[in-house]
Design a protein with these regions (language model features):
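Conserved, structured core segments of small domains
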Residues: 1-96
Length: 96
């Protein structure tokens, strides 16, 4: 299932990781593990934020997906998402 992970990094904790040179290594490890369809990075309400679209085949994967973010104090949200083709398919099945 296509999922959207949003992670917002605590500014002080992320600043420390940047100073130590480890934030980029952590992000690269996460991306290598998830093999995302796409990933985007921005600032949101004063926090470093990433949006990662990836495929999750089983809910039991959730702990290993989220834990690297939790370890650095990030706030994480994961939710299923659709692309336009998924939406068309879903709407075509609506009986109304």
């Amino acid at each position: 299932m296509r999922m959207l992970l949003t992670a917002r990094f605590n500014t002080e904790a992320a600043n420390q990781l940047v100073t130590e040179g480890t934030l980029s290594k952590i992000i690269e490890g996460i991306l290598e593990h998830l093999k995302p369809e796409s990933s985007y990075f921005t600032a949101m309400e004063g926090e470093r934020t990433c949006f990662i679209v990836f495929d999750m085949t089983e809910s039991s994967q959730l702990p290993t997906i989220c834990e690297p973010f939790f370890q650095v104090g990030a706030k994480v949200a994961v939710r299923p998402v659709m692309n336009a083709e998924d939406l068309r398919t879903g709407l075509s099945q609506y009986p109304g």
